[in-house]
């Protein structure tokens, strides 16, 4: 029995939508049952009532006419190259099994010969593998935070596949010929920044034919540290103070761990990955002035994201 309420919506299609570049960003679900620590879908960063309703009332809004919106974005964008599913809420959270909107989008993408870029902490049904594999530019990003299942449960506080399930899923998709990016992302300071555990996870991913690994360090919306103080203390006494002392750089409206910590982490992660013949990259990470530091750590993998 689900512990959330579904609210079905069919927002009007904006026929004059602005050009948005090569990525069509698609969120069929507003709200995410995974409830990951510091996730922008549920921490108030996105100033939309739909996301507030999930956090405050347990209501997931689902966009029933999502295919109409996808087609409209394609029509209004000359350079549309990929459907990104999803940039915020997980497309394969438990509600998907009931409503199957993500399945509809993937099937539609296959019908119109448009590649999809999927990002999930959940399980992608095997029935979709042929549709994903059909387009040579489609790929799947599996978010696997750590090899330590107990730590994963601390951070993915709602649903989400286990470490073993995610590794099995990666292996199955790799064997099917689907391009995979493993996202060890984000790194949570003092929780998942153990380099021995990171290396052990990289070894398991390499066994499953993963070639690309992406990472980042968690950033935090203002107020979230205070809201999560009790939870951080339950994980480790003194952890909330460590986070307060580490998250001192406010950049573009969010708090970031100081640049020295982040660069030290990325240098170590890159060294581990490259020593094993894997490509390493980071998602967008700014310095204190808001300038990207990605060029220091990313290779051609960045072009896939």
Which residues does each predicted region cover?
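Conserved Radical SAM active-site core
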Residues: 1-141, 147-154, 163, 167-168, ...
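Alpha-helix N-cap and loop-to-helix initiation/capping positions
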Residues: 58-62, 97, 157-165, 193-200, ...
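Hydrophobic faces of well-ordered beta-strands that scaffold small-molecule active sites
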Residues: 81-83, 116-118, 140-142, 180-184, ...
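Active-site beta-loop-alpha junctions enriched in small/polar residues
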Residues: 88-90, 121-123, 143-147, 185-189, ...
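Surface-exposed cleft-lining segments at the edges of enzyme active sites
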Residues: 91-92, 150-159, 185-190, 255-256
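A short acidic (Asp/Glu
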Residues: 95-96, 128-130, 191-195, 225-227, ...
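Conserved strand-turn element in the central/C-terminal portion of the radical SAM core barrel
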Residues: 158-159, 173-194, 220
């Amino acid at each position: 029995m689900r512990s959330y309420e579904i609210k079905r919506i069919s927002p009007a299609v904006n026929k004059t939508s602005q050009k948005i570049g090569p990525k069509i960003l698609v969120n069929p679900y507003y709200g995410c049952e995974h409830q990951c620590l510091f996730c922008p879908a549920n921490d108030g960063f996105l100033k939309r009532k739909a996301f507030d309703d999930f956090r405050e009332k347990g209501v997931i809004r689902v966009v029933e006419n999502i295919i109409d919106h996808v087609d409209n974005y394609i029509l209004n964008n000359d350079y549309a190259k990929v459907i990104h599913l999803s940039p915020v809420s997980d497309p394969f959270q438990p509600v998907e099994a009931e409503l199957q909107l993500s399945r509809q989008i993937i099937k539609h993408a296959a019908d119109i010969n448009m590649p999809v870029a999927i990002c999930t902490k959940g399980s992608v049904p095997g029935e979709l593998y042929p549709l994903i594999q059909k387009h040579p530019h489609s790929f799947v990003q599996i978010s696997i935070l750590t090899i330590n299942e107990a730590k994963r449960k601390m951070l993915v506080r709602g649903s989400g596949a286990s470490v073993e399930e995610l590794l099995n899923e990666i292996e199955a998709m790799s064997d099917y010929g689907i391009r995979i990016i493993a996202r060890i992302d984000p790194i949570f300071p003092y929780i998942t920044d153990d380099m021995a555990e990171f290396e052990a996870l990289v070894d398991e991913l390499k066994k499953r034919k993963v070639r690309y690994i992406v990472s980042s360090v968690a950033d935090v919306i203002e107020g979230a540290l205070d809201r999560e103080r009790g939870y951080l203390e339950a994980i480790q006494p003194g952890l909330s103070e460590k986070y307060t002392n580490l998250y001192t750089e406010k950049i573009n409206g969010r708090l970031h761990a100081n640049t020295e910590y982040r660069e030290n982490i990325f240098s170590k992660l890159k060294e581990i990955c490259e020593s094993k013949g894997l490509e390493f990259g980071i998602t967008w990470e700014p310095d204190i002035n808001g300038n990207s530091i990605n060029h220091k750590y990313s290779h051609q993998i960045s072009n896939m994201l």
